[in-house]
Amino acid sequence: MSTSILRRILDPTRKPKPDAILSISLLTTVSSPPSPPSDPLISDAVSILTHHRSKSRWSTLRSLQPSGFTPSQFSEITLCLRNNPHLSLRFFLFTRRYSLCSHDTHSCSTLIHILSRSRLKSHASEIIRLALRLAATDEDEDRVLKVFRSLIKSYNRCGSAPFVFDLLIKSCLDSKEIDGAVMVMRKLRSRGINAQISTCNALITEVSRRRGASNGYKMYREVFGLDDVSVDEAKKMIGKIKPNATTFNSMMVSFYREGETEMVERIWREMEEEVGCSPNVYSYNVLMEAYCARGLMSEAEKVWEEMKVRGVVYDIVAYNTMIGGLCSNFEVVKAKELFRDMGLKGIECTCLTYEHLVNGYCKAGDVDSGLVVYREMKRKGFEADGLTIEALVEGLCDDRDGQRVVEAADIVKDAVREAMFYPSRNCYELLVKRLCEDGKMDRALNIQAEMVGKGFKPSQETYRAFIDGYGIVGDEETSALLAIEMAESLKLRAEEES
């Protein structure tokens, strides 16, 4: 049976019969042990490797063949060791270390098969990447195609496992050989042989990441044959590699990142209606985030309720998604209710949970509640990000109470010292302006000095703030001098830019 399948792969002119659609999981080979080698060198090498102690086998092996082994000889020796894949790998590394074999795709393929059939995934993948590098020296043939053909030709003799083709596709993806991975998938699929679902998902994800969500979606349709036949027939044809939630989650995330939130909804409908796949909590989270990003909170809340009806357990990501969406859309009261619900269910908050609430309160003009959450956040050992701190600063500076700007300056000072916070120019200028308006010139000068130390040259707005500030406290002389300095500075800056 395996010989027939391999012939179908190697011969591009042959077309499989309609009833010959086989899963790659059926491509298994049970071969008899290799016949005794006719070359005495090979039998001697096998004997040394299998019967000598580990400390002596390598020196004895070098004495046996100082000039090294040909790739063909290496393959024959390794075939005799195929039931001991770790020894086969050590033999390979030994020949590489002492330059005892000029390995090619043929010798690498033998070892790849032996490692694959023993599920030594990482080692097999490493040898596949080496084979791809060795194949790159041949300018007349695509290197991935060359390795693929070599694996096919040696498949039966090595008693390999279909898993080897999945490793080849994934190794191509790791090496950024997208075209090569697609080519292997197409060659297998054209003969009715399917890769594992994890391999299909990896291919779709990588195409989406490197070539855009739309191309990833096209690859999904091709991999699962959804454009070849009717939907009902496609469901039958997919068989054992029916797309799973991970497949759809990957595509939804890709479209969401590109801002195509309507496509997120389309993928969701295909998942449920066309393929009949059940979404998981991650799927719901992505859909809710897509609605929240568009401000469609009523739709997001419907998804939230659907999760409850279907018995999908909310995780921290689900809570953070809804809390963030509600806070961004001025529904901080509902967000606070979800926050309390988290506590009742024993779900630990994350830094992001608190940041959403702080930003939500500040956006709604309730900076005092934002400060309460911020202080609770710090008590629990979380450090807010820059946007959250600047939201607090803006909220405090909008309050005309003179002490609030001092509170804002203290928050920035502590954040710079404790959390490696780097205020933006706008943050510095806002503090300077409000301090000057309240006549707190010494504190404003300290902020301005720190601002210059961070590489922010005084702008016209900064000069204006100090000029007005010194005027407020009655220091007209300093105010006038700053006006002259500002004019000279702006003139010099204009000359430098021209």
UniProtKB/Swiss-Prot annotation:
Q: Which Gene3D superfamilies match?
A: Tetratricopeptide repeat domain
Q: Where are the PPR repeats?
A: 244-274, 280-314, 315-349, 350-384, 385-423, 424-458, 459-489
Entry superkingdom: Eukaryota
All disulfide bonds of the chain are none
Keyword 4Fe-4S listed: no
Pfam families with a match to the protein in the record: PPR, PPR_2
The UniProt keywords, alphabetically, are:
Repeat
Using the record for this protein, list the coiled-coil segments as residue ranges, or answer none: none
Q: Which family does it belong to?
A: Belongs to the PPR family. P subfamily.
Name of the protein in question = Pentatricopeptide repeat-containing protein At2g15980
Q: Which organism is it from?
A: Arabidopsis thaliana (Mouse-ear cress)
